[in-house]
C-alpha cells in the first residue's frame, strides 16, 4: 500500500502538468527575450546560448521547487525542441534541447530535486542544450550551411556568420553559457531562498 502511494506521489498530476506548462512558457519567453537578439545578427548568433541563459535561471529553479518530480525539466526542453523544429532551425538545436533537458532532469533527480547546487548544475546542462546547432556547425560547417540554405536562410546571413566565426568563438560560447547560467542560477537561488527553505530544498 505504501509503495502504491509513493508511486502515485511521484506521478505528475493534472495540477502538476498545468504548473509545468505555465513555467515552461515563462522559460521560453525568458530564453527568447535574452537570447533572441543575438540570433537576429549573424555575427552574434553563436552567442545565442549565452544570452539565452541569462533570465530563465530563477524560473527554472522555481519550477523544480513547485514540481520536484521526474519530467518537468524534460517537458520544458521538449517544448523548446518542438519550437526549434517548427520554426526551421537546424536539427542540432532540437537534438540539443532534447538531450540537454533529459540529462538536466536526470542530474536533478540524483539529489531528488532537493539540492540547490545540483539544481543549478542541472540548469547549466539545460542551457548547454542550446548550443546543439552550433556544435553541429563546428563538426561539419559545409553540411550545416547547405542545410540552412535548403531551409531558406538568406545566403548573405550565412556568409556574414561564417566569416565571423572561429574556434575562439566556439570556446567563448561554451564558457560563456556555463558562466551566465551559473550566475542566473545563483541569483535565482538567492531571490527564492525563502521559498526553497519552505520546500525543503537545501544547499
Question: Model-derived features: where do they sit?
Answer:
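Short, charged juxtamembrane terminal tails flanking transmembrane helices
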Residues: 2-6, 193-203
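Membrane-embedded alpha-helical hairpins and interfacial helices in multi-pass inner-membrane proteins
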Residues: 45, 120-193
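Interfacial aromatic-anchored transmembrane helix boundaries in multi-pass membrane proteins
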Residues: 35-44, 80-108
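Short helix-perturbing small/polar motifs within transmembrane alpha-helices
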Residues: 29, 97-134, 185
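Aromatic-anchored segments of alpha-helical transmembrane domains
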Residues: 24-32, 79-87, 125-135
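Hydrophobic transmembrane alpha-helices
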Residues: 2-71, 75
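Hydrophobic alpha-helical transmembrane segments
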Residues: 17-22, 50-51, 73-78, 94-95, ...
Amino acid at each position: 500500500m505504501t509503495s502504491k502511494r509513493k508511486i502515485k506521489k511521484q506521478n505528475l498530476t493534472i495540477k502538476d502538468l498545468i504548473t509545468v506548462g505555465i513555467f515552461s512558457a515563462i522559460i521560453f519567453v525568458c530564453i527568447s527575450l535574452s537570447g533572441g537578439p543575438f540570433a537576429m545578427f549573424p555575427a552574434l548568433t553563436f552567442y545565442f546560448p549565452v544570452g539565452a541563459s541569462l533570465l530563465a535561471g530563477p524560473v527554472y529553479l522555481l519550477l523544480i521547487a513547485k514540481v520536484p518530480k521526474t519530467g518537468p525539466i524534460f517537458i520544458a526542453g521538449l517544448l523548446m525542441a518542438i519550437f526549434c523544429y517548427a520554426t526551421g532551425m537546424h536539427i542540432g538545436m532540437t537534438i540539443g534541447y532534447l538531450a540537454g533537458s533529459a540529462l538536466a532532469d536526470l542530474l536533478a533527480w540524483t539529489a531528488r530535486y532537493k539540492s540547490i547546487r545540483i539544481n543549478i548544475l542541472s540548469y547549466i546542462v539545460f542551457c548547454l542544450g542550446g548550443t546543439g546547432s552550433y556544435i553541429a556547425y563546428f563538426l561539419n560547417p559545409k553540411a550545416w550551411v547547405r542545410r540552412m540554405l535548403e531551409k531558406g536562410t538568406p545566403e548573405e546571413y550565412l556568409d556574414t556568420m561564417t566569416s565571423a566565426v572561429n574556434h575562439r568563438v566556439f570556446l567563448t560560447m561554451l564558457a560563456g553559457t556555463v558562466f551566465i547560467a551559473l550566475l542566473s542560477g545563483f541569483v535565482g537561488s538567492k531571490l527564492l531562498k525563502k521559498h526553497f527553505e519552505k520546500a525543503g530544498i537545501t544547499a
